[in-house]
């Protein structure tokens, strides 16, 4: 979804799905705090978490913690990209094509431990997973707009 803010094109996902796996040894409250730390203040009040109990590869108990952000009031992408360190922004910029599917979903994985500490970092292992859905936008336009935002 895109909007205009004055003369500026505002790129905003129509939906953001956040999911993270919690292990039996982890504190669920801390995992929720990590998720809250990557969300703009104005979106936190609307978050509702679902927790699903699952079984890991070795029979160990794990939890899938999920939340969905809809009707975003602010610019989540701007918030996210400003929080990323320069080296992570560059890495994401260089790999952007691999993070966007043909349905204009933009996927990002963030470091769960860093998020708990109030930092935003890209990380593939044991991450907080974000799936940002964009409607009524061509993939090529989405890539171009994300590139522009990441270069700021």
Predicted feature descriptions by range:
Residues 31-34, 78-85, 146-147:
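Short amphipathic alpha-helices in soluble, non-transmembrane regions
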Residues 26-30, 73-79, 117, 140-143:
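Short, conserved charged micro-motifs
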Residues 20-24, 39, 69-73, 112-116, ...:
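Beta-strand elements of well-folded, non-transmembrane domains
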Residues 45-72:
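Short, charge-patterned binding micro-sites
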Residues 78-123:
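Long, charge-patterned amphipathic alpha-helical coiled-coil/hairpin "stalk" segments used as oligomerization
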Residues 1-46:
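Long, hydrophobic N-terminal alpha-helical segment
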Residues 106-152:
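Glycine-rich, aromatic-bearing surface loops/beta-hairpins
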Residues 38-43, 84-88, 126-129, 150-152:
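A common structural junction motif
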């Amino acid at each position: 979804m895109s909007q205009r803010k004055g003369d500026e094109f505002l790129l905003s996902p129509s939906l953001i799905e956040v999911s993270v796996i919690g292990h039996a040894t982890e504190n669920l409250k801390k995992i929720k705090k990590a998720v809250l730390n990557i969300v703009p203040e104005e979106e936190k009040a609307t978050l509702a978490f679902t927790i699903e109990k699952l079984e890991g590869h070795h029979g160990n108990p794990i939890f899938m913690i999920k939340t969905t952000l809809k009707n975003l009031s602010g610019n989540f992408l701007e918030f996210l990209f400003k929080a990323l360190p320069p080296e992570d922004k560059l890495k994401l910029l260089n790999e952007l094509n691999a993070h966007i599917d043909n349905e204009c979903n933009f996927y990002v994985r963030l470091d769960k431990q860093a998020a708990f500490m109030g930092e935003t970092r890209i990380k593939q292992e044991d991450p907080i997973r974000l799936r940002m859905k964009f409607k009524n936008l061509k993939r090529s336009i989405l890539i171009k707009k994300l590139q522009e935002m990441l270069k700021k």
